[in-house]
Amino acid sequence: MAMGSYLSIITLNVNGLNGPTKRQRLAEWIQKQDPYICCLQENHLKPRDTYRLKVKGWKKIFHANGNQKKAGVAIFISDKINLEIKAVKRDKEEHYIMIKGSIQEEDTTINIYAPNIGAL
C-alpha cells in the first residue's frame, strides 16, 4: 500500500450528477483533493447511469442508487490503496452504502445520506 500513516477520506453532497459538466468538475476536484476514499451523497443517478460517474485512478466505485432520480450515494476507493473488499451493504431507499474491508487491518466505511424528515 502506498499510503503513509493516515487514511484521507473526503465527503461531499453533490446535489445531483446528471449533467456531464458537473461530473467532469467533480472528477477534477477529486483528483485535486487526492484522498484515498471519497464518499458522495445525493448523486441522483439511476442504476443504469452509474457508468457515467468515472474518475481516472479510481476503478473501485460502489453505488446505492434507485430507479428514481433522487438520493443515491457512492464510495470511491483510490487505486493507490489495496483495499480487500469483504462485504458491501446497500439499502433499498438509496440512503446508505457500507463497505467492510481490510487494508492492513479491518476497516468499515459507511456513506449515509439522511434527507430532511419531510423528504422521506
Labelled PLM ranges:
Residues 1-120:
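A shared catalytic/ligand-binding motif for oxyanion handling
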